[in-house]
Amino acid sequence: MDRYAVFGNPIEHSKSPLIHTLFAKQTQQVIEYGRQQPDSNGFNDAINAFFTEGFIGANVTSPFKLDAFRFADELTPRARAAEAVNTLYKRQDGSILGDNTDGAGLVQDLQRLWGELNGKRLLLIGAGGATRGVILPLLTAKVQNIHIANRTASKAQQLADRFKKEGVITASGFNDLPEIQFDLIVNCTSSSLDGGLPEITPSIFINASYAYDMTYKAQATSFMVWAQECTPSIRTADGLGMLVGQAAESFYVWRKVRPKIEPIIEIVREML
């Protein structure tokens, strides 16, 4: 039986074992999937022992995505662009492939919810690792342009400069947004986890069709509520579909079988 696990600290809250067990049942794959919680500075020892013991693949979450990025023998283009790895796979020759499926999970969920992204004008709020991990997949999906807004404008600009050869991408602080309209706004910050909001003008929602929050809760997140208060016609969604989507992409990297995510999203949401 092929064995997998998710690495993080803390990790007891992770839904990855549930999601991958459901994927395996759906696709008639026989796997074992568990949790691993190394000490904050113990990732390399733990992951080396993990693969030495015969495990096939791992998911990696906070705070170890950069450690996994450095550990991999080879990186996919999307992992290199993200400068972080959330999926490790031991290939038949023994080498370790590092991948990042976060952006693919977001793109798949946005397309599932609202159709193709081709020609859409996007605003990404925040300029941290969550933002960096999704830019290349979004540009590959042929969005018209991406604008990154961040409290510290220079950090947003650095991120835009990094990807400017891949597509039309601009940046600003929260207080000097360009006077353009956005079709889709994605909150890449974790502000909703404690009921907060990004410190950005509500005018961003004027004429926007969609607002997406990367975080998720049992009820609508504070960002989703805010978007609908500002523009009642806007369609909103949280990041649970992204979570399941990135897991499905990892499952495909390992098993070469692509699970159907909608039934799994429904099951996981009922358990929130």
Curated annotation (Swiss-Prot):
Pathway: Metabolic intermediate biosynthesis; chorismate biosynthesis; chorismate from D-erythrose 4-phosphate and phosphoenolpyruvate: step 4/7. GO terms for molecular function: NADP binding; shikimate 3-dehydrogenase (NADP+) activity. One of its GO terms (cellular component) is cytosol. It comes from the Bacteria. The keyword Amino-acid biosynthesis applies. It is an enzyme of class 1 (oxidoreductase). The active site is at K65. GO terms for biological process: amino acid biosynthetic process; aromatic amino acid family biosynthetic process; chorismate biosynthetic process; shikimate metabolic process. NADP(+) binds at G126, A127, G128, G129, A130, N150, R151, T152, A153, S154, K155, M214, G239. The keyword Transmembrane helix does not apply. Its EC number is 1.1.1.25. Shikimate binds at S14, K15, S16, T61, N86, D102, Y216. NCBIfam families: aroE, PRK00258.1-2. Belongs to the shikimate dehydrogenase family. This is Shikimate dehydrogenase (NADP(+)). It comes from Pseudoalteromonas atlantica (strain T6c / ATCC BAA-1087). The gene is aroE.
